[in-house]
Amino acid sequence: MESNRMINRILVATDASAASNRALEMAAQLSTQYDAELLIIHVIRDMQIPFDIKEIPELESDTIESFATAREEIMRKVAESVLRDARAKAGKAGASKVETTIGTGDPATSILDVAKRRETDMIVIGTRGLGKLKGQILGSVSRKVTNNAETSCLIVR
């Protein structure tokens, strides 16, 4: 069923930072205003174990593998918790059609892929998240998303 509304599906990225929480609040308000679906994404960054660490004789490959598996499990549980909280906040703000998804890898690439695959009409993102360069006006993820998105973007301060 095709809708005549301009905004039918909104994607908002969250990392539980203050900026992403403000973006979530704005996206939830827009979702309510436009009766649009709200898709919330949290991205787990790929953090490969450096190849040269595998060359250290004291570290057995089983130990390295166990560490990688434990890290992945912890990051997935963190993502699930972040998304559970985000869904609750969106609901409190009035959003009724809310979905969550976990992305992996480079955050900007993952956000852009989901936006394209899910045919979102708008991406809402905070100015900067939990990255290292706090003094920047736009974070690297926000910049990459807005520069490469095929849809409208709203950057929330």
Question: Which role does the model predict for each range below?
Answer:
Residues 151-156:
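Short, flexible loop segments at boundaries between secondary-structure elements
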Residues 42, 127-128, 157:
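Short secondary-structure boundary segments
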Residues 116, 122-147:
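Glycine-rich, Arg-bearing micro-motifs that act as flexible, cationic patches
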Residues 2-64, 93:
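Small/aliphatic-rich secondary-structure junction motif
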Residues 62-74:
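Short glycine/proline- and acidic residue-enriched helix-loop micro-motifs
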Residues 1-6, 73, 77-123:
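Structural beta-alpha unit
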